[in-house]
């Protein structure tokens, strides 16, 4: 089981796994935890280290506010650029054999620091890394946005989505109709 959450030391995931008795790897990738878990699980299976693997992530709005921004009790006014972290969880079971969607490739991103220091504008802060990851994926695989039904980023929101779209437009790559962000859905 590869699992993570938005709390220190992945405490939510660790508590969930404590009585399960399955091998557990705690991951802390913040917004990238699910993509990280899925890609690592696929690599473990492809490398012959596992027949099946579970990829899990969870988050809680109030915990994320406390961890990354301001506790709700603080009473701060949310600026229009602030993200709304979901309270929820998701899990995928990956297997070496069977029917269903397949992980055929993964592109791991790099850290891109655009100098954004406003914790209420994470979309603008994360957008350059999302752009670089997608750009690297297209270059490494020889694919284009036309090869995909939908390209989805995790939580860039309105501003981050606009930044990614503009960066690709500057490259002459049109994403319209192919790109969305979970923060807009």
Q: What label would you give each PLM region?
A:
Residues 71-135, 140, 177-185:
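Condensing-enzyme catalytic core mediating Claisen C-C bond formation in acyl metabolism
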Residues 21-24, 66-77:
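Short acidic, glycine/proline-enriched helix-loop-strand junctions
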Residues 141-146:
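Short helix-terminating capping/connector loops at secondary-structure junctions
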Residues 1:
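N-terminal glycine/serine-rich phosphate-binding loop of ATP-dependent small-molecule kinases
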